[in-house]
């Protein structure tokens, strides 16, 4: 029987996250890329640099999100040359929105723009499929996001420190990896503030384990029977 899964487009499945904190933003993503039922790449990088202080998290079709990122990077470079100063995060978000909206019938991708500029500080913009742009204190996207809305409602708070924001992002991505079959691999993060951008990498064996992944704990009856293999009543 012919297997058509390998002929399907690369999909980033994906969990992508952007969080603001008191001083900047933290972006995070898993690393699994799928082709049909197959994992095409288990260590892909879904956080793409647009400028020195602006990055984009990509989900959906790998080809679509990559070509949009390439065009946005090119236009931002031209913008910087013409104006003599770096583009703001809002400009990057609006360019991404414009490309997504004008090609909404042909693109299958959702993105999160995050960065820092001297005018507005750290900003996060969510751009779902279709080309809407939403400024948010935090944004989540991709197939793993459906498992995270309740978690973020409880865990996110205004005015977090950098350490708290980084821990929140890594914990959230690891939770999505445990629940979502299309998310997996490692966790990559980018922290962006006035000092620039810092990338971090968290391997799969260093991530927090969740309920289904923990070793089963024996019940009290199991312990009793294990310590007394001979029946107490003959």
From Swiss-Prot:
Molecular function, one GO term? threonine-type endopeptidase activity
Q: What is its EC number?
A: 3.4.25.1
Function of the molecule: The proteasome is a multicatalytic proteinase complex which is characterized by its ability to cleave peptides with Arg, Phe, Tyr, Leu, and Glu adjacent to the leaving group at neutral or slightly basic pH. The proteasome has an ATP-dependent proteolytic activity.
Subunit record text: The 26S proteasome consists of a 20S proteasome core and two 19S regulatory subunits. The 20S proteasome core is composed of 28 subunits that are arranged in four stacked rings, resulting in a barrel-shaped structure. The two end rings are each formed by seven alpha subunits, and the two central rings are each formed by seven beta subunits. The catalytic chamber with the active sites is on the inside of the barrel.
Class in the EC hierarchy, top level: hydrolase
What CDD domains has UniProt attached to this entry? Answer: proteasome_beta_type_6 (cd03762)
Q: Which reaction does it catalyse?
A: Cleavage of peptide bonds with very broad specificity
Q: Where's it found, cell-wise?
A: Cytoplasm; Nucleus
Propeptide residue intervals: 1-13
Please name the catalytic residues of this protein. 14 (nucleophile)
Establish whether keyword Cytoplasm is in the entry: yes
Which family is this protein grouped under? Belongs to the peptidase T1B family.
- Keywords recorded for this protein, A-Z: Cytoplasm, Hydrolase, Nucleus, Protease, Proteasome, Threonine protease, Zymogen
Describe how expression is induced or repressed.
Up-regulated by elicitins (cryptogein and parasiticein), salicylic acid (SA) and hydrogen peroxide.
In terms of superkingdom, the source organism counts as Eukaryota
What InterPro entries does the record tag this protein with? Ntn_hydrolases_N, Pept_T1A_subB, Proteasome_bsu_CS, Proteasome_sua/b, Proteasome_suB-type
One GO biological-process annotation of the entry reads: proteasome-mediated ubiquitin-dependent protein catabolic process
Keyword Transport set for record: no
> PROSITE patterns of this UniProt entry?
PROTEASOME_BETA_1 (PS00854), PROTEASOME_BETA_2 (PS51476)
Kindly provide the name given to this protein in its UniProt entry.
Proteasome subunit beta type-6
One Pfam short name: Proteasome
Q: What are the record's GO terms for cellular component?
A: cytosol; nucleus; proteasome core complex, beta-subunit complex
SUPFAM superfamilies xrefs: N-terminal nucleophile aminohydrolases (Ntn hydrolases) (SSF56235)
């Amino acid at each position: 029987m012919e297997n058509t899964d390998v002929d399907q487009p690369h999909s980033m499945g994906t969990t992508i996250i952007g969080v603001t904190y008191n001083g900047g933003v933290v972006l995070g993503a898993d690393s699994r890329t799928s082709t049909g039922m197959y994992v095409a790449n288990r260590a892909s990088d879904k956080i793409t640099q647009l400028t020195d202080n602006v990055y984009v998290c990509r989900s959906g079709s790998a080809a679509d999100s990559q070509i949009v990122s390439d065009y946005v990077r090119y236009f931002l470079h031209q913008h910087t040359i013409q104006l003599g100063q770096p583009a703001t995060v809002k400009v990057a978000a609006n360019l991404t929105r414009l490309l997504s909206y004008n090609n909404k019938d042909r693109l299958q991708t959702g993105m999160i723009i995050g960065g820092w500029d001297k005018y507005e500080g750290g900003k996060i913009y969510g751009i779902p499929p279709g080309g809407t742009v939403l400024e948010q204190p935090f944004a989540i996207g991709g197939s793993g996001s459906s498992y995270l809305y309740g978690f973020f409602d409880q865990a996110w708070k205004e005015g977090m420190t950098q350490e708290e924001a980084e821990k929140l992002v890594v914990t959230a991505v690891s939770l999505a990896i445990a629940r979502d079959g299309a998310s997996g691999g490692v966790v990559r993060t980018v922290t962006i503030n006035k000092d620039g951008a810092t990338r971090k990498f968290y391997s799969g064996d260093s991530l927090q384990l969740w309920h289904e992944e923990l070793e089963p704990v024996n019940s009290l009856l199991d312990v009793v029977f294990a310590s007394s293999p001979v029946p107490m009543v003959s």
